């Protein structure tokens, strides 16, 4: 089984090995990107997530979701 490598634009995310354990975070926040996926998995709507994590913009969240969708749709993963 092949795995998807998701390329995320620098205007959406940042990572610093010295901060937050090197976790990938939304740009200009300390909110880890994986928090979005965890919340969606738990049944939280995107609107609720954005209300709870005010520093994350809708454009950032949708951009991350679109990048993940694109990576998972790659025919080379079949």
Report each predicted region and the residues it spans.
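Intrinsically disordered, low-complexity and often Lys/Arg-enriched segments
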Residues: 1-9, 77
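A short, structured beta-strand/loop element
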Residues: 7-48
